[in-house]
From Swiss-Prot:
It comes from Pelobacter propionicus (strain DSM 2379 / NBRC 103807 / OttBd1). Tetramer of two alpha and two beta chains. Pathway: Amino-acid biosynthesis; L-tryptophan biosynthesis; L-tryptophan from chorismate: step 5/5. The active site is at 49 (proton acceptor), 60 (proton acceptor). The alpha subunit is responsible for the aldol cleavage of indoleglycerol phosphate to indole and glyceraldehyde 3-phosphate. SUPFAM superfamilies: Ribulose-phoshate binding barrel. Belongs to the TrpA family. This is Tryptophan synthase alpha chain.
Length: 267
């Protein structure tokens, strides 16, 4: 069974929700990323999203854009990310999802990417700028290797798009809680509950929600409505502000506070 599927099944049995943490692979370098993955799991993360750095991250706000720039400056490539995941898998089995843009995957080759990612131990992939209606070739290769492809939905997604994502997506659906780019927000949308209920009526896979979640209270509020909550920019910001042991301590403290705030998630 795919690690993502197993993770959501286990969380449901425990009556809690998934904490999904996003960091950029290679920020500040891949050695740090490799060390951070088990640290995130130990602090309470259930699923790790690894951002694949890209030179034109159109959906990302300044925090993740700067993170991508730092990773690219450290010579981070898709091939090196997969080698790092392969090394992580020697001792850590936390579900790992690669998230990013289509261009690097297209350049790598769909079949080669699906094969190499699956062999490295990647469980899922989310391509921000790949509409599900245009994903057939990529999906064929990914599904053949049990590489679960997730898609984004937003508050402006049509019923037709929701139905298509429900038919084609696997692993989970990533619901974007706000329109615009990534980045911390002050509060959770008051309409989120109704929006998620509309999606849930048409979707059978778990729904995780993210974009803008930066505090334990926000994480708790979103987790009460979704199957999981994604925290990205607020975590990535720590990589800009800290390094070394201080970074490890700050990441551990922040992730543990998120996990403890989620209903049923206290250690």
């Amino acid at each position: 069974m795919n690690r993502l599927t197993h993770c959501f099944n286990e969380l449901k049995q425990r009556n809690t929700k998934a904490l999904v943490t996003f960091i950029t692979a290679g920020d500040p370098d891949l050695a740090t990323t490799q060390a951070m993955i088990p640290l995130l799991q130990q602090a309470g993360a259930d699923i790790i999203e690894l951002g694949m750095p890209f030179s034109d991250p159109m959906a990302d706000g300044p925090t993740i854009q700067l993170s991508s720039e730092r990773a690219l400056a450290a010579s981070t490539t898709l091939e090196r990310i997969l080698a790092m995941v392969r090394a992580v898998r020697r001792s850590c089995q936390v579900p790992i999802v690669l998230m990013g843009y289509l261009n690097p995957i297209h350049a790598y080759g769909y079949e080669r990417f699906a094969n190499d990612a699956a062999e490295a131990g990647v469980d899922g992939v989310l391509v921000v700028d790949m509409p599900p209606e245009e994903a057939e070739s990529f999906l064929n290769h990914a599904n053949a290797r049990d590489l679960q492809v997730a898609f984004l939905l937003t508050p402006t997604s049509t019923d037709s798009r929701i139905a298509t994502v429900g038919r084609l997506g696997r692993g989970f659906v990533y619901y974007v809680t706000v329109t615009g780019v990534t980045g911390a927000r002050q509060q959770v949308s008051t309409t989120l509950g109704g929006e998620l209920a509309k999606v849930r009526a048409k979707i059978s896979v778990p729904i995780v929600a993210g974009f803008g979640i930066s505090t334990p209270q926000q994480a708790a509020d979103v987790a009460a409505m979704a199957d999981g909550v994604v925290v990205g920019s607020a975590l990535v910001k720590l990589f800009q502000l800290h390094s070394g042991e201080e970074l490890r301590q700050e990441v551990t403290r922040f992730v543990a506070s998120l996990r403890q705030a989620i209903p049923g998630g206290a250690a």
